[in-house]
């Protein structure tokens, strides 16, 4: 069953003698399943290895979470027929379309900002680069800790600079979104401390107020 407003996806997969259901369409592809279809908002089905029976048809109204494409979604997933990675390229392209800033490099705040930055770089003609690398094995997402000082520490410790791509450079960074602003603030301060000449920020999603 999918939630009645369709805020989160639910997709069905199939192969000979088996069926599956998953939040992410990529989850079962390496297991030999192919995508059968997505459930509509509020739709309820009964599955067996050989069939799918609709118990409650989908309703017309949908309020799917747009954050799936800009942030939460895995790059190889599709939601409502739209591939996440392709949507992020398009978002970056649109950000660059009417932008007139001059920079040396375009970069994304890893990981989900990276695809947006590639789209921006492709449209603008400015080269894509990775002025810092994210180190994540021991650090959670920076917005998750309840304490602000811990959020600041996490955001700081995750970023490892590439000095030759920062010092004296004009940089344009794209982040997927602004939730608490912790990662963005720490990123900008980090880049200036590392010798950046200019730092321009473009969020792929409007700030959450």
Indicate where each model-derived feature is located:
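N-terminal segments that mediate ammonia production and transfer
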Residues: 1-113, 121-163
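Extended, hydrophobic alpha-helical segments in both membrane/secreted and soluble proteins
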Residues: 106, 113-120, 124, 128, ...
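PRPP/pyrophosphate-binding module of the type I phosphoribosyltransferase fold
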Residues: 153-209
């Amino acid at each position: 069953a999918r939630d009645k407003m369709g805020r989160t996806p639910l997709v069905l997969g199939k192969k000979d003698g088996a069926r599956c259901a998953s939040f992410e369409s990529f989850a079962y592809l390496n297991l030999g399943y192919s995508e059968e279809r997505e459930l509509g908002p509020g739709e309820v089905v009964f599955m067996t290895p050989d069939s799918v029976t609709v118990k409650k048809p989908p309703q017309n109204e949908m309020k799917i979470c747009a954050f799936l494409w800009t942030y939460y979604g895995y790059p190889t997933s599709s939601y409502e027929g739209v591939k996440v990675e392709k949507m992020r390229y398009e978002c970056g392209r649109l950000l660059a379309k009417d932008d007139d800033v001059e920079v040396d490099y375009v970069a994304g705040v890893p990981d989900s900002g990276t695809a947006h930055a590639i789209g921006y770089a492709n449209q603008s003609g400015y080269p894509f680069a990775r002025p810092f690398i994210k180190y994540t094995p021991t650090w959670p997402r920076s917005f998750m800790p309840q304490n602000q000082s811990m959020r600041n520490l996490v955001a700081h410790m995750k970023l490892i600079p590439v000095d030759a791509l920062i010092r004296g450079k004009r940089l344009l960074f794209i982040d997927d979104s602004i939730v608490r602003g912790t990662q963005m603030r720490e990123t900008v301060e980090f880049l200036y401390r590392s010798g950046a000449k200019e730092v321009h920020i473009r969020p792929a999603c409007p700030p959450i107020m």
